[in-house]
Amino acid sequence: MNWEIVIGLETHTQLSTDSKIFSGSSTRFGAAPNTQANAVDLALPGSLPVMNRGAAERAILFGLAVGGKVAPRSVFARKNYFYPDLPKGYQISQYELPVVEGGTLSFFVGEEEKTVNLTRAHLEEDAGKSLHDEFSLASGAPASGIDLNRAGTPLLEIVTEPEMRSAAEAVAYARALHSLVVWLGICDGNMQEGSFRCDANVSVRPVGQKEFGTRTEIKNVNSFRFLERAILFEARRQIELIEDGGTVVQETRLYDADRDETRSMRSKEDAHDYRYFPDPDLPPLVIGQDWVDAVRAGMPELPAAQRARFEADYGLPAYDAAQLTVSRAMADYFEAVARALPAGQAKLAANWIMGEVAATLNREEKDIDAAPVSAAALAALINRIIDGTISNKIARDVFAAMWAGENGGDADAIIAARGLKQISDSGAIGAMIDEVLAANPAIVEEYRAGKQKAFNSLVGQIMKAAKGKANPQQVNELLKEKLG
């Protein structure tokens, strides 16, 4: 039997506010345990929550960016459950009336564009954290404890429809969402610090079946690689279980990266188990049209708009435009390079950034902001390819030297110091061709007998004689002339 995977994602995006969603405590990461929790965060009697306007503003910005409906009136609700790191015994969230409803997010899986519908985005507070190596007893023995620094940190939970059908598609969506929230400046996107965490709802069903299978939820995956592996494992587990005559149980599971498996955490609750009801201490969040308009006026150019502009203004293919707008920094880098080149050369800039630059960044695990070769420096190098000073092949060697900081990272200085200037004198190239032809009569005859590989062999020998510095286009043209 052929199976189809059905995936929906819930993403907890930590909003980049200086203070918590309902209190004035700092949201700074890495402070000593329980040094950033006040009476509201600790749920002390008599303390009352006050809504953080900045958190609401970031939610509005997100809603506008994805084309969702920003609710003129949304309500905070108490989500009741017990957990050691939840001091109030409930979490303040939104249920029936979220701040954003609907919206879409488009992204590429390989070179295929996909669009996923969003169900909602709602504001809520984060819980605290259980720690097992930060506390000790009076005797000095290690002890577990609760750190409430994170309690009350503002989150925007973004929920998709169950429309994704592969782990690769889910990861591509998560990457696109991550890029968007960082692009908008509403989240720092630091997955190691927990600023962007995904819950994956996974089920399987026979291909062609309309009804969904029983889903499990994989909680708090904070790595794109782990998200893909967790979904793949869970889908395989469910398929094998069903094919062996078992039944999938609705439950919450955790992904164990060391064992590359998911394991049961607890039975999965339904909404009614949380006994949601409106929080009596918080008034409804009322968002007037003037507030929405003010946020819209301050919006940056969105990735989708910039992709369209790159296609229209620079003639880039849709895939290239998508790759170059994965972050504002990458888009700005490309545009700075393209503007420093002659008209019509933007595709060459795109090829270099998606090729040599991206590969080197990935290898060194750096972001474009940390690239030692600036946009201006890369443009200077590409201009030397365009004007024929060096070949594309030699340019890659020059780029590596620039990245390493040789000669101050200056392309012209490296070319001069290494003697890499391309030979474009037709007389000098012609003389080298004559020598190679005279030394290889058998290969010449093979070419004239119709063997194309023989031509490539001759080109290789000519380039070797020129130490790679002969203009490849001129070599090809002159060689064809001489061979008749």
From Swiss-Prot:
E.C. code: 6.3.5.-
Originating species: Bordetella bronchiseptica (strain ATCC BAA-588 / NCTC 13252 / RB50) (Alcaligenes bronchisepticus)
Family that this chain belongs to: Belongs to the GatB/GatE family. GatB subfamily.
Catalytic EC class: ligase
Entry protein name: Aspartyl/glutamyl-tRNA(Asn/Gln) amidotransferase subunit B
PROSITE patterns associated with the record: GATB
Reactions that this protein is recorded to catalyse: L-glutamyl-tRNA(Gln) + L-glutamine + ATP + H2O = L-glutaminyl-tRNA(Gln) + L-glutamate + ADP + phosphate + H(+); L-aspartyl-tRNA(Asn) + L-glutamine + ATP + H2O = L-asparaginyl-tRNA(Asn) + L-glutamate + ADP + phosphate + 2 H(+)
One function term, GO molecular function aspect: ATP binding
Subunit-structure text: Heterotrimer of A, B and C subunits.
Pfam families: GatB_N, GatB_Yqey
SMART domains noted in UniProt: GatB_Yqey
InterPro entries (alphabetical): Asn/Gln-tRNA_amidoTrfase_suB/E, Asn/Gln-tRNA_Trfase_suB/E_cat, Asn/Gln_amidotransferase, Asn/Gln_tRNA_amidoTrase-B-like, GatB, GatB_C_1, GatB_Yqey_C_2, Gln-tRNA_amidoTrfase_suB_CS
Function statement: Allows the formation of correctly charged Asn-tRNA(Asn) or Gln-tRNA(Gln) through the transamidation of misacylated Asp-tRNA(Asn) or Glu-tRNA(Gln) in organisms which lack either or both of asparaginyl-tRNA or glutaminyl-tRNA synthetases. The reaction takes place in the presence of glutamine and ATP through an activated phospho-Asp-tRNA(Asn) or phospho-Glu-tRNA(Gln).
Sorted UniProt keywords: ATP-binding, Ligase, Nucleotide-binding, Protein biosynthesis
GO biological process: one example: translation
